[in-house]
């Protein structure tokens, strides 16, 4: 995380700034509220019909969650089913849905079975072709219904767009409540927020392991920045970078075996490679400036990072192997301040924070063309993080002096705001795709 415009833009001021990010704020509620702004072009009209048996589920109903998931992307136009209630393909009158303007139709059942379980069966239909596009069948416990709804939305999203859905993923972020800092993990829609660790000293830079089972982060609990890795299921953790001086900015290698970290153990802040258990220290960068905020390419061959070696904070790329004699290639040339790079999941570009005048905005740059696209028009954006399908970027911003989380589509057309009623939220990180157990 880097300074906002109201703070010093000098890289050397990073460590001091971190202590003053949340000086004054009110207690926050755990649940995130979502507001959606804008919509993508050529939205797909889809109808989600309330499932048979869903009326008995009450607040655990599936279709409201599915509809909300799809609507947040800006890619879908939800068609009101009106009084039409088919639950099986033989009950569907396709001309009626054509008249309603639906291109796709989701129908299904959610029926209680033995052991208090709920048997779910969903079909996605192509209205014009009168054919099945996909289906979802699962039996779950009542407390798993919301997760099942996200998986259904993932299926619908993938069948209609060709991209993998990310509704079943999780996000991590830091929330400040009074004098307490809490690293939390929540579902991608902001529900089911759970604290990972809490302290009265700052917690920053959460980073997900590629398999989603661990979080690396920086804690100031011992009055200095130390990098920890914590296993979410067991809540056990280990200090993996606690060298003399500053330890910060952890980034996982794609295979989960290594971490890139920023250390000042040899003087100025430089990027090092360590094993995920803290061993095997290896220096990656050697410059007269400050090198920080590393991000691995999806194939693990390169890192991009922020450095002021040229006189202003800019983004560079260099190979991971080859020793400190490797030459770093400068990537950003528009403006005097470009920071916080993160590779796109396909490796074809990266997101970062670009300063234009007094505004710090989320941007995307393409490796092949060098073209830069600004995605936001707010003033105090920071910490961008790609969704695992590359279609959205999660980031922190400020509204009326309070930190909130927002997400913007990679084309800039749709934005969603995730906020608590009060409080201050920062340091977002979008987790990887969740693997089926």
UniProtKB/Swiss-Prot annotation:
Signal is among the record's keywords: yes
Record field: compositional bias (Polar residues): 410-423
InterPro entries: 6-blade_b-propeller_TolB-like, PD40, Tol-Pal_TolB, TolB_N
Keywords: Cell cycle, Cell division, Periplasm, Signal
Region (Disordered): 410-437
Cell compartments where the protein resides: Periplasm
Gene Ontology process terms (BP): cell division; protein import
Signal sequence, renumbered to the chain: 1-30
One matching Pfam family: PD40
Major subcellular site: periplasm
KW Signal (keyword) present: yes
GO cellular component: periplasmic space
HAMAP family noted in UniProt: TolB (MF_00671)
Subunit structure: The Tol-Pal system is composed of five core proteins: the inner membrane proteins TolA, TolQ and TolR, the periplasmic protein TolB and the outer membrane protein Pal. They form a network linking the inner and outer membranes and the peptidoglycan layer.
Family: Belongs to the TolB family.
Protein function: Part of the Tol-Pal system, which plays a role in outer membrane invagination during cell division and is important for maintaining outer membrane integrity.
Protein name: Tol-Pal system protein TolB
Naturally occurring in which organism (per UniProt): Nitrosospira multiformis (strain ATCC 25196 / NCIMB 11849 / C 71)
